[in-house]
Amino acid sequence: MASSNGVWGIEIGQAALKALRCHLDGDTIVADAFDYIEYPKMLSQPEAEPAELVAEALEKFKERNDSRNFKICMSVPGQSGLAKFFKPPPVEVKKLADLVRYEARQQIPFDLDDVVWDYQMMPGSTVEDGYALESEVGLFAMKREMVARQLQPLDRSGVEVDLIQMAPLAIYNMLAYDRMHERIENETFNVDSPPTSTVLLSIGTDSSDLIITNGFRIWQRSMPLGGNHFTRQLTKDLKLTFAKAEHLKRNAREAVDPKLVFQTMRPVFNDMVTEIQRSIGFFRSLNKKAEITELLIAGNTVKMPGLAGYIGKNLGLEVHVLDRFNRLSGDDVLSVPAFR
């Protein structure tokens, strides 16, 4: 049982285990510990033993860090669960839970006894005299068997998880807190004249999450492209082992022929731009009054030279690498190169 106000956030990724511990100091969130444990092989490599690699990483985490008496929050891929948003009719707030349960039966394609689910009224919802008028509700669910599967590595290692959250929603929460808090706290949401939206692209190892939000509303999509696709392109065209291709990708500018490396990866650059364009286009078809003003990109792959500029040039958007947090303190952690 956690006895402090500190929280560990843990992600079991395809390439590494990542963990960040934060605590509250008054109203300030302070990062006070961080760990990044890269696996000897990526979990998706054919010869890898994922369960063994993750178990070894968790043992290292426990040896190097104090996780007792802290809450543990685990992020899981967006495709592990379901997130849907709907606009309920005007209803008494005290009856909203019953309305949401009815909606859950319609929206969740499984028996509710087989899922873990919850809901949240989104910021900007209008509540007057005990009635929710103009509102939007987020509905979130995961199959119980999927929850058990995600928890299994930590259960086996004796790490007790207090909270599970799908990664795209965690990203939204970060944006809402770190960059849009003044808007959410001080502005009234107008569905006919919504505030500008931000796109955040989180590039993972085998897939990427794209989130579009104005702070009050959220739209998300998982894209079947990640950092490994660049590596595989090099493996295929340059006849390299996966390990050598990964090293070349990470050190492209120091290669014997950098131009050849980037030309080889260009098809994946183009595929990524196409996927982003398709996602933004679909979002705009559903939200005709939305105005997108910037694209933030995150993940280790964004360190690859030229990627951010290439995406921005082809999309016609201002692109920024998400390499800092406005409302997170703790220089001892924030200055660590592995964290950045």
Residue ranges and their predicted role:
Residues 224, 245-294, 301:
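Adenine-nucleotide phosphate-binding core of ATP-dependent small-molecule kinases
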Residues 290-320, 324-326:
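Glycine-rich phosphate-binding loops at beta-strand->alpha-helix junctions
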Residues 1-38, 70-77, 133, 181-230, ...:
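Gly/Thr-rich phosphate-binding beta-strand-loop-beta motif of the actin/hexokinase/Hsp70
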Residues 42-46, 145-173, 179-181, 215-258:
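Glycine-rich phosphate-binding loop plus the immediately following alpha-helix
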Residues 170-173, 228, 302, 320-340:
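Glycine-rich phosphate-binding/hydrolytic loop that grips phosphoryl groups
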Residues 1-107, 148-150, 156, 160, ...:
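Non-catalytic, solvent-exposed interaction/assembly segments
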Residues 58-71, 157, 240, 277-294:
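Phosphate/pyrophosphate-binding loops at sites that engage ATP/ADP/AMP, CoA/4′-phosphopantetheine
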Residues 71, 76-184, 294, 324-331:
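Active-site neighborhood for divalent-cation/phosphate handling
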